[in-house]
């Protein structure tokens, strides 16, 4: 039903229709649902276009992604400071911010087969920028969480607020 009604919030309605019943499963977080289902749906066969659309709209916010948004000052700029957890998925939280950013980026410039708006791609790019398995730049292994980042070689340095993750003791 949610898929049949057009409108700018169509994908959000489809996600909600799919995820809300699954949130009743005790111990399964939004992050786990988004991560698992997005991988499954993005890998759907070509004739399952709606599955791929919904999978591409699912944003999995882990601590690396949340902490990146905090350290760079993005959460503060959106007046969305909050601790990591369920607030990341509330209106105005990390997932909404990434969705907003994704609407400003044409993902087809990276791969012509991508949809123009691809929130999962933006979230994954942030994760890869931070993760040890990726570029290993913006994370607790490289930055003392009690201090501001001092990596002047970082491509984001001049636009980054370089906020501490924790107050210095």
Feature annotation, model-predicted:
Residues 1-169:
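HhH-family (HhH-GPD) DNA N-glycosylase catalytic core used in base-excision repair
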């Amino acid at each position: 039903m949610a898929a049949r009604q057009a409108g700018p919030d169509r994908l959000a309605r489809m996600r909600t229709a799919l995820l809300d019943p699954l949130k009743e499963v005790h111990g399964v977080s939004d992050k786990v649902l988004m991560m698992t289902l997005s991988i499954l749906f993005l890998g759907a066969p070509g004739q399952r276009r709606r599955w791929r659309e919904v999978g591409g709209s699912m944003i999995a916010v882990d601590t690396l992604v949340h902490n990146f948004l905090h350290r760079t000052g993005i959460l503060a700029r959106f007046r969305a400071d909050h601790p990591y957890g369920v607030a990341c998925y509330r209106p105005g939280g990390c997932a909404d911010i990434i969705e907003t950013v994704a609407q400003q980026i044409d993902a087809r410039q990276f791969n012509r087969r991508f949809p123009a708006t691809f929130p999962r791609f933006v979230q994954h790019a942030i994760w890869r920028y931070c993760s040890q398995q990726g570029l290993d730049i913006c994370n607790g292994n490289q930055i003392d969480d009690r201090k501001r980042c001092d990596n002047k070689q970082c491509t984001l340095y001049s636009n980054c607020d370089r906020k501490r993750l924790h107050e210095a003791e």
